[in-house]
Amino acid sequence: MPKASFIKTIIAGNLTDEYIIDTKGKAYNHACGGSLLYTAAGAKPFIDEIGLLSRVDATYPAQWLSKLEKKGFDTRGIIQSVRPFEQRRFYAWRDAEHCDNDNPVTYYAKNGLPFPHELLGYHQENIAADDAVWGNIKISVRNGLPREFLDVTSAHLCPLDFSTQVKLINLLESGTVNTLTITPSNQYMKSEYVDELRVILKGAVAFFPTETQMISLCHTRARENWEMMELISEMGCQLVVVMRGLRGFWMFDSKTNKRYTLPL
């Protein structure tokens, strides 16, 4: 049973079972991963008291959750779904910034690697449908979420589908969160979602799209990158931080109207 602890920040995202082939053709099979894990690991040196909010099914290894607890994370917000869903992810890295996610059999064979039996039946197209599982999980204090998770002052949402992020924002607004940051999902970073994005950004302090996501969202409303960032900021968030891979970041501060180009 996860131990109760004092927490200052919540991070919400996915926990996944990853199968990775790196640029040198080396495989890393059945590894604990996911947006929640990577974000929490990056935040840990700066924020010690972190609560994790996610969902897993019954096949998710209990020892992975135990390791997170031993690292000092509060895992009481990780909810087990009674319905199984696709937790596996496959990444075949072509270079430091680009990877392929489908046809794992081809990539294992190409690199002369034995195919892991745990990856049998994996199809990339199953993931988007299974992400909707979030929408079927009741996340509230009445349904087992620790009250302390609503008493924090800050929260970050990792990439999740639109309806899930809206659901989590509504949940956090019922508590004491006053600093909310968001990393978007490809699912809604499209031009048809521009007007709906206000629902998510109205109370956010910072928004972290990739350059590709920003262009996909804003290309019908703006042409220049800084103009796109200003358009996003007008939807309610103060800081728009565009992630550009190895090229670093762009940041627009709507409060001061200042622009920054930052190295990696």
Residue ranges: model-predicted function:
Residues 2-7, 154, 171-174, 225-264:
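Conserved phosphate-binding/catalytic region of the ribokinase-like
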Residues 4-6, 17-26, 30, 48-154:
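Conserved N-terminal subdomain of the carbohydrate kinase-like
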Residues 6-16, 181:
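Short, hydrophobic/glycine-enriched beta-strand segments
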Residues 25-41:
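Short catalytic helix/loop segments, enriched in acidic residues and glycine
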Residues 41-49:
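Alpha-helix C-terminal capping segments
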Residues 64, 164-172, 195-199:
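A short acidic, amphipathic alpha-helical/loop segment
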Residues 147-150, 166-179:
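Glycosyltransferases and closely related glycan-assembly transferases
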Residues 204-211:
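A short beta-strand/loop micro-motif in the catalytic core of glycosyltransferases
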